[in-house]
Each structure stands twice: as structure tokens, then as C-alpha cells.
């Protein structure tokens, strides 16, 4: 007697026409989607007869990387919000980085990776940069050596985000006048939840 999974697979194959992988580990591509057949709970089925199904599409890819391409003085807007703005987007797969606000908006619940590198130049003040999640600081980095002409505040983290959550960089302390060039802000979806 056929189980639900076997009937689903037969029904899908019948609707899509013939689709064969060369071996059991190759995915079967049906109408642009990748159908992956795997054991959904290997510890509960020592015989290896249970099957689980996972369907993924290319739209699951999420990544961005933005930089400051020029030195400039902070704008009136950035002086009010203290958000660090990035004027050149190098990568924006999924279009979830809002370049006007320099804010990443999570398209789905998942684990995300973020890293930043904010450079201060010829500035004797200590700077503190924070990665903000919905207005709350998650991690911070400092650059405060008064004897060097260039120094960076850098950090990275994995965080769980819900759909619609916002992440951005905020200057919590100091100023970046005269040296934003070479600063970067990047992130990507590690895996959805």
C-alpha cells in the first residue's frame, strides 16, 4: 500500500511528466522548483523507509553589501538619526537593503549574519558603532586610539530576525567627520526558520 509521501511523489511526477535524476541524491527539477526528497527524522526511522519533502526556490537567497565610496561630511539627516549611511550598494540579492535609509529589512524569519567595518580618519575622538535591530543595539564596536590616523570599529554577529525586522548601523558616540571612505556593512540569510 502506498503512503501519503509516495502518492504525492507519483502525483507530482504524473502532473509534471517524466523527470528523473541520475541517482537517489540528485534533485528532481519540476517547473523551476527543486524537489528534494530526504529522511525527515532519521533517528526515528532506523530502517530508512520514511521520507520527508522540502521544496526550495531561488527566491530564498538574501544578501547585501554596501560601502561608503567617498569621504563626506555627515548630512543633516544623519546628524539627527545618527544612522550611518552607505552610498554604494555592491550586492542586493532579494532587494531587502533599503539604500535610501541604509537599512536591511528581513524578508522572512531566519538566522542572519551581519558584519561591519566603519573607518574613522584623522579623528582623535573615540567612536562607538552599534548594529541596531528594530531600534535596539545588538552589538557594538569601538575605535579610540588617538595616536593613529586611521582606525576601524568592526564586529559581526548571527541574529534571529522575524519578517519585517530592521537592522542598521548607528553612530552611538563620537563623529565620523572627514572619513567615511572604506566603511562597509554586509549581511545575508544563513537559513530560514
Swiss-Prot record:
Outcome following mutation: residue 38 to A: Abolishes homohexamer formation from homotrimers
Signal peptide region: 1-21
Keywords: Cell membrane, Disulfide bond, Glycoprotein, Membrane, Postsynaptic cell membrane, Secreted, Sialic acid, Signal, Synapse
Residue stretches making up the C1q domain: 57-193
Keyword Signal tagged: yes
Gene Ontology, cellular component aspect: extracellular region; glutamatergic synapse; parallel fiber to Purkinje cell synapse; postsynaptic membrane; synapse; synaptic cleft; trans-synaptic protein complex
Effect of residue 112 to H: Retention in the endoplasmic reticulum/cis-Golgi
Principal location: secreted
Source taxon at top rank: Eukaryota
Phenotype of gene-disrupted mutants: Mice (reeler, weaver and staggerer) show defects in granule cell migration and parallel fiber formation, synaptogenesis, Purkinje cell dendritic maturation and establishment of adult cytoarchitecture show a correlation between the formation and number of parallel fiber-Purkinje cell synapses and cerebellin levels. CBLN1 single knockout mice show a major impairment in motor behaviors. Double CBLN1 and CBLN2 knockout mice exhibit gait abnormalities, impairments in balance and coordination and develop seizures.
Gene Ontology biological process terms from the UniProt entry: cerebellar granule cell differentiation; establishment of localization in cell; heterophilic cell-cell adhesion via plasma membrane cell adhesion molecules; maintenance of synapse structure; negative regulation of excitatory postsynaptic potential; negative regulation of inhibitory synapse assembly; positive regulation of long-term synaptic depression; positive regulation of synapse assembly
Region listing for Essential for interaction with NRXN1 and linker of two C1q trimers into disulfide-linked hexamers, in residue ranges: 34-38
Gene3D superfamilies noted in UniProt: 2.60.120.40
Region described as Essential for interaction with GRID2: spans on this chain: 122-147
Parts of the chain that traverse the membrane: none
Functional note: Required for synapse integrity and synaptic plasticity. During cerebellar synapse formation, essential for the matching and maintenance of pre- and post-synaptic elements at parallel fiber-Purkinje cell synapses, the establishment of the proper pattern of climbing fiber-Purkinje cell innervation, and induction of long-term depression at parallel fiber-Purkinje cell synapses. Plays a role as a synaptic organizer that acts bidirectionally on both pre- and post-synaptic components.
Quaternary structure and partners: Homohexamer; disulfide-linked homotrimers. The trimers are assembled via the globular C1q domains. The trimers associate via N-terminal cysteine residues to form disulfide-linked hexamers. May form oligomers with CBLN2, CBLN3 and CBLN4 prior to secretion. Once secreted, does not interact with other CBLN family members. Interacts with GRID1. Interacts with NRXN1 and NRXN2 long (alpha) and short (beta) isoforms produced by alternative promoter usage. Competes with NLGN1 for NRXN1-binding. Weakly interacts with NRXN3 short isoform and not at all with NRXN3 long isoform.
Stated name of the protein: Cerebellin-1
Species this chain originates from: Mus musculus
Amino acid at each position: 500500500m502506498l503512503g501519503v509521501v509516495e502518492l504525492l511523489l507519483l502525483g507530482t511526477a504524473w502532473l509534471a511528466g517524466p523527470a528523473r535524476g541520475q541517482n537517489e541524491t540528485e534533485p528532481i527539477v519540476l517547473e523551476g522548483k527543486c524537489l528534494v526528497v530526504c529522511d525527515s527524522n532519521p533517528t526515528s526511522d532506523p530502517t530508512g523507509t520514511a521520507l520527508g519533502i522540502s521544496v526550495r526556490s531561488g527566491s530564498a537567497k538574501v544578501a547585501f553589501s554596501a560601502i561608503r565610496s567617498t569621504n563626506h561630511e555627515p548630512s543633516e539627516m544623519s546628524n539627527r538619526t545618527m544612522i550611518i549611511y552607505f552610498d554604494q550598494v555592491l550586492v542586493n540579492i532579494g532587494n531587502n537593503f533599503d539604500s535610501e535609509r541604509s537599512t536591511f529589512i528581513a524578508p522572512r524569519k531566519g538566522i542572519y549574519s551581519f558584519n561591519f567595518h566603519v573607518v574613522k580618519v584623522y579623528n582623535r575622538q573615540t567612536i562607538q558603532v552599534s548594529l541596531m535591530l528594530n531600534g535596539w543595539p545588538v552589538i557594538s564596536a569601538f575605535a579610540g586610539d588617538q595616536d593613529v590616523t586611521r582606525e576601524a570599529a568592526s564586529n559581526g554577529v548571527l541574529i534571529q530576525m522575524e519578517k519585517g525586522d530592521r537592522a542598521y548601523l548607528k553612530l552611538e558616540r563620537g563623529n565620523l567627520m572627514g572619513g567615511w571612505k572604506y566603511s562597509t556593512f554586509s549581511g545575508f540569510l544563513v537559513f530560514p526558520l
